[in-house]
Amino acid sequence: MTPADYDRLLTVIRALLDRQTRVIAAIDGRCGAGKSTLAAQLQAQLSCRVFHMDDFFLRPEQRTAARLAQPGENVDHERFLSEVLQPALRGEAVTYHPFRCARQALDEPVTVQAARLTIVEGAYACHPALWDSYDLRVFLTVDAAEQLRRIEARSGPEKLRMFQDRWIPLEESYFTAFDLPARCDMALKG
């Protein structure tokens, strides 16, 4: 992301904070685009709370063929809405159960205190079931070659193959079905 794009994003967030008691922003986009990195930078600079869509992967019993055939259904958006967004919209502390991939199960509850600014980062953050909860929606993109380079550097060649075969096609289907790059308030290159 260019410094100018980052500054523009900060300006938009600060303007929202000047006008509203609470702000909830979503950072969606392609894997490897820098969503987690951007959220961490914003958290350090703005003292906000951050929630990761990776903590809301589907549990094994939810991964039905019918569900996965629908764009954007590769995340437990129902649980995310009830455990995170509804309390955040009320200005309350959030208690949620992160999904742990290694165990394929929900972990012990985590409580995050209320904050004026809440950032939600990760693929599927702008799912239609969650869309209206946000004051700002950001789509982060990356070109295909750089995406693969970043994923391999972060996860290794074995995981890269899984991303190419499974995760990237699921994400791209979701982005296309809901026209996210065009619908989000901001589309930035990560």
Locate each region found by the language model.
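P-loop (Walker A) phosphate-binding loop of NTP-binding proteins
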Residues: R30
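ATP-dependent NMP and nucleoside kinases share a basic, alpha-helical "lid"
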Residues: Q104-R154
